[in-house]
């Protein structure tokens, strides 16, 4: 049951960018799509926030960091990135997050890391060089790559904050953290995205998925209900039922699923070297994630993929 839920979560998370990109290409600003996703999911998760309202008093810094970095920061950077580069490439760049976390642990906190973790970092960086085709002078939009890297850095920012908070005597309920993170993220994004300036008429029309028209409201419904609410809930439940190693492997499947969906539904094809590089990135991320020190937050990070790897109990990356 746990493995089934983990696979459902990976598929749901993997489809977020594939559903969001047609809306962006139809005329919505990436920030507006992020706001719709986060605000809609926050509304659905509001009952959980009420149920866990004691978290506001017990862990305000953690909730603020989750909302600012893991929700608003990661999603804004990721959706802005996929408006400029392929979905699969953006997500694979995000998979540098576990490697960046280990870099922070080793060089800033000056805590030891294992040799296997160092190998994972080298693999992740080397694989990324293949994904972005450095030999061709970075064939992708530089700003798009920078935004994807920004999403990875936001995950590291949340790790740093939650790692400092992890000495607390009691771990908060992850669903409560998600609910408040979405509410805080929605509040921040409302100020930044200014949704009152959105072209709402786009949502009443259609968006093209590789030339096939799809109702915009269906894509939005997928992003909010499936790729956010259902993905988080199934992800949290599955992590509680699986070992950290299995959960980490399944989390890596999100990038594979997103790349395949983008290939089939959006026509975003990757070259053979990019596919090989993507496999190497995922292998490096998995090794880095599974070889990290034992001290870690147990709260999930918004967005899936490497964010979800950072949430696996018993790991720091």
Model feature map: region roles:
Residues 12-17, 46-94, 130, 224-242:
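Specific transmembrane alpha-helical segments of multi-pass solute transporters/efflux pumps
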Residues 19-22, 40-59, 123-139, 183-216, ...:
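Membrane-interface helix-cap regions at the ends of transmembrane helices
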Residues 20, 25-73, 98-104, 154-161, ...:
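Transmembrane alpha-helices of multi-pass small-molecule transport proteins
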Residues 32-43, 79-118, 151-152, 245-263:
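Specific alpha-helical transmembrane segments that line the substrate/conduction pathway
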Residues 34, 38, 133, 218, ...:
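C-terminal-most transmembrane helix of multi-pass membrane proteins
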Residues 45, 101-102, 137-204, 300-317:
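Transmembrane alpha-helical segments that form core, pore/gating elements
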Residues 75, 90-96, 161-186, 224-264:
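Helix-helix packing/entry segments at the starts of transmembrane helices
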